[in-house]
Amino acid sequence: MKFTRYPKRDAIRDYFPLPNEIFSLGLSTGEIALYAYLMYCEDRKTFQCHPSYKTIGNAVGMSKNTVKKYVDSLIEKQLITAEPTSVYTQKGKKRNGNLLYTVRPIAEALEQYYEQQLIRLHEENRRQ
């Protein structure tokens, strides 16, 4: 029996990309975990996914309220967008569905982060 240290895996199916720049944005561990899970779930062609707060919470070990807090934070930092969806029941009633998350290009988030850093620097210089 031949020993193989690492089993062969399909790079596209078994792995997901996480940009290196994500660690330069000053994100908390919860934000990084949530962002990584959304990257894991996303469709690689549309950059969209639609897990529920409960599904995300179970995957990363957070409560639904904590997931909502971090989703709002990632939206504010322009890393993701979230759009409400709706579903129809068998009886024809319209209900709220899961949010549709779109993972935005990391360059936009970096640009906003650097702009905020410059604004803070200018404010600190004015105070001195």
Predicted regions span which residues?
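Proteins with a high burden of low-complexity, intrinsically disordered sequence enriched in S/T/G/P/A and R
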Residues: 44, 126-128
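Short recognition helix of helix-turn-helix/winged-helix DNA-binding domains
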Residues: 1-66, 72, 94
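Winged-helix/helix-turn-helix nucleic-acid-interaction surface
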Residues: 64-126
